[in-house]
Amino acid sequence: MRALLIYPLFPPTFWSYEKILELVGRKVLLPPLGLITVAGILPQEWEFKLVDRNVRNVTEAEWDWAEVVIISGMIVQRDDMVENIKEAKAHGKLVAVGGPFATSVPDEVQNAGADFLILDEGEITLPLFVEALERGETAGIIRAQEKPDVTTTPIPRYDLLELDAYDSMSVQFSRGCPFQCEFCDIIVLYGRKPRTKEPAQLLRELDYLYELGWRRSVFMVDDNFIGNKRNVKLLLKELKVWQEEHQYPFRFNTEASVDLADDQELMDLMVECYFDAVFLGIETPDEESLEFTKKFQNTRNSLADSVDKIIKAGLRPMAGFIIGFDGEKQGAGDRIVRFAEQTAIPTTTFAMLQALPNTALWHRLKRENRLLDESKGNINQTTLMNFIPTRPLEDIANEYVEAFWELYDPHGYLDRNYRCFLKLGAPKCKTAFKLPNLVDLKALAIVIWRQGVKRDTRFRFWHHAFGILRHNPAVFEHYITLCAHNEHFLQYREIVRQEIGEQLRDYLSRQQQDKVEETVLSPTAIAAETEKVLAS
């Protein structure tokens, strides 16, 4: 069987990092780990070709070659996924679709023309798909009620990737999260009991990446890397030895809950394994909103103190913030900005709350008749809320745009970055010395020219750079990399302001039109007009 695997386009997002990737001559931040895992699960006598549409388009030769087309993606990739399903059908191909989007909204995928829907987790459903093909079936919906044992998951087919196109590779140690955040779809898709691989299993994946010549960053894509602290510590103890033996070829980052700060041993192990950054779902500094959305793990200790501990341990924080929670008070955007400034978090992803399909939030809003469009929850930073909030949407949208704009003001960003790296714990591992390549030197020269010469940030840029060299030189390379990141954020805040502004104007226009129509067609208005006619 000749299988063509297609990964749909992402729209421009906070994480697309176009301007940063341009600097270093790469096209995409991360590879499609789900699809290359699918390729590892399917029969290895099959032939595979993979096209990441974020890297390049599918060629006619590839369409002609394929016997079956397999597409997977997330909700944010909806539009291009639907287009590729239609394109595959136009080429007369059998189309199978899976992944988070198809699992969450199967009707949309089926309506687009998919033949097979391979839903839930592939370790169980992909073998059932293969059996269906062997029986001669040409369509079907394949689901699984149980969660698979991920210790049986094969090594992803990293060899199918165009490795030079990616800035970082992805590996996964665990699935699931023990918490119960109302808005989160991870616990819906993967459950609340974290399932982990064996340490030796993950090390084999790293061995394979190493054999393929990979020597850059690796992102642990676990939704909560520390969901099972016991097992993750077992992994880190073995990973530390592996990294030492291989002279630390990989720099790691990941996602974790804020209670990471409560476990010094765990943070130390991560830093000793060459983890240097962690994404934290902080969401909001408003404790009432955290409790309402059931993010109780963020209310047990001071969030500011937790972030400070994580920084001092040697892990740069990236933080996720959300605006628009039920019961939220005016000024939430300002409070988020103040918190980011207070805690010196350089990179803060920020979005208006969305009700993602089948989450607890989605079900509650559906019961309350507050969903504006049941199927179109999104996770992009340029999308208005898809439900009726408890305070005016225009207030939330305006606060959001203003806060996003302020967070990525070039002066404020450099200051926040500087304060973070002044106290960032130094790396605890000795990496092999290597000369910078020409691409990296060119990128550095561009950043210095833009931020240290051309723009009015020049004084701050040089003051802060020399300050880091003087007070914390071990983190200087990491610091300069984060300075470069604002090349993307400067552009993206313009996109946020423009697209949210356009959507808000359309929304307010529709609201006004609805009011006019309601007034014109209301029984009171009709009765009044009738009386006028009779009186005349």
Curated annotation (Swiss-Prot):
One of its GO terms (biological process) is methylation. Keywords: 4Fe-4S, Iron, Iron-sulfur, Metal-binding, Methyltransferase, S-adenosyl-L-methionine, Transferase. Pfam families: B12-binding (PF02310), DUF4070 (PF13282), Radical_SAM (PF04055). Residues 163-394 form the Radical SAM core domain. CDD domains: radical_SAM_B12_BD. The keyword Zinc does not apply. Binds 1 [4Fe-4S] cluster. The cluster is coordinated with 3 cysteines and an exchangeable S-adenosyl-L-methionine. [4Fe-4S] cluster binds at C177, C181, C184. The keyword tRNA-binding does not apply. This is Uncharacterized methyltransferase sll1242. The lineage of its organism: Bacteria, Bacillati, Cyanobacteriota, Cyanophyceae, Synechococcales.
